Structure formats: C-alpha cells, structure tokens
Amino acid sequence: MDSSFTQVPLTIAVYPHFMDHCFAGKVVFPAVEALKILAGLIGERDFFTSAFAPGHMADTRFNKFLVLEPGQETIEALCNIRPIDDTRISLSLATRFSTKNGAMTRIREHCTATFYAKTEPVPNLSPVHVHECEEPVFKVATDSIYRELVPFGPAFHSIKDELRLARSGAYATLKAMPDDPDDPFKTMLGSGFPLDGAFHAGCVWSQRFFGVVAFPVGFDKRIIYKPTVEHQDYTARVIPQYQTHGTLGFDIWITDKQGDLCEAVSGAMMRDVSGGTITPPAWIREGIY
C-alpha cells in the first residue's frame, strides 16, 4: 500500500437533530458521527485491496470539539489519510480556522482513528458483562439524566427508563434513535446512538463516583460484531477499568435483546473537558463518602 499522506476536502451535511447535541451551551458535532464519516470515506475510496470491514478501529481520539452554529447546514472539512500497511489506515477529520487577527489559517483536528481491514471472532462474555451486579444500585431516572447530568436535547436521549449505577459499573437500556433518512452513511457502522448513550452512562457514573463530569476523549479499540439498527433497543454495560491523571478508563459492551454482543469498546477514555467549570449536582453524590 502507498504510504503517502493524502488530504481530501469534504462537505459534511449537518442534519437538524445534531442541534440537540450540546456542551456548555454550544452545539457540537457528535463524535460517533465523525467516525461514520471516516469509515464511509474508506468504503468510497477503496483504500484496501481486500474486503473492508469498517467495524474494527483503534487508537481513536476525539481531539477538539467541532462547534456548529445555529442553523448551520454543512461543514467544510478535511480528511487526512495516512496508510500504514495493507491492513491498517489512519484517518483524521479536521477543519480550517483563522487566527484571532485573521492573519493566518490553521488546521484543527477533531477526530483521529486507525481502521483495520480484518475481523475478530466474537468473544465469550464473562458473567460480569452479562448479568447485573448484586451490590447496592443507585437508580437515576432518564428525565433527570437529560435535564441535569447530560443536558442534551430529545434527539439524543438514548438512555431509556432508568440508569443503574454501582461501583462495578453502569447498566443501561438504550434506544437506537432514528438517523436522518438522507444520511448516506447511516448504516456504515450501524447506529451511533447506542455507543453515544453508553458514553452518557459513563458520564453519569463518573459524576456519582468521582464527582467529575467526564466526556469521552477517545478509546483504544472498538469492534462492531453486529451493527446496531435504528429504532431497536440495546443493553449497555459500562465497566470502569482505571483512573489516572484525571482520566477514567472504561470497557463498554453493547448487546441486543437476544443477548448477542453487537459491539465492544476497550479503553474508552473519559475526562473533564470543561476545565472544572461544570460540576455535578449534589444529589448524584448522595451516599458517597
């Protein structure tokens, strides 16, 4: 495979429901959508000589928020492409921006990921992944989550019913919300809403047990075994693995109603990205000492 670096201009559609994806009063482009864009570009351009299975990605980072303006309909972006070998390719989604005085134009990367042209067998889930724990559980109603803890609009209310939190992890029923019918990449990686909802669960868990509003900043590996489908329900297990230098690490397992593993994320990294300006409400820490 050619090891040269390629930069491809992109015009990305901004669908109306993206306006419900907000952080600190600003609308931000969803990270799961950025991954769909990158996977779709690989599929369109046929970078691999073998069949491309887009559901295997690693070393993924959500570098900077891509802020959207109210009513914005498109994003003029760049995709930086760097083939690694015959089975791996690294891509990043970036935009141009001007310095404050307008004298210079620079590139800002928003998402980077390495995609693999290979598949892996579905692992056997251990009991901790399949069954809820027997330790005390703190339950959080969905309306409280999206009103006070993860204040996204209705289009991104992926957690159904109530979220169950224990020291050993978060347990959620998720709804794959509808994608825009005009989205050409809507089936590329399956629905992005279940993973987005799992990140919401990790954010709430972080608020309860660590007192920090943690948002995803990347992951080590994500494998999609069975693409999720819009309008369907799924179950997420968000399992804490480590805490270091302000970053919380999780593994995420998303299963369907039959108990089949749909996707697994290892080394999901979450941290406070507000600089300490956003803090959890007191009630979510009730009983934590």
Language model: regions and residue ranges:
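Acyl-thioester-processing domains in fatty-acid/polyketide/NRPS systems
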Residues: 1-289
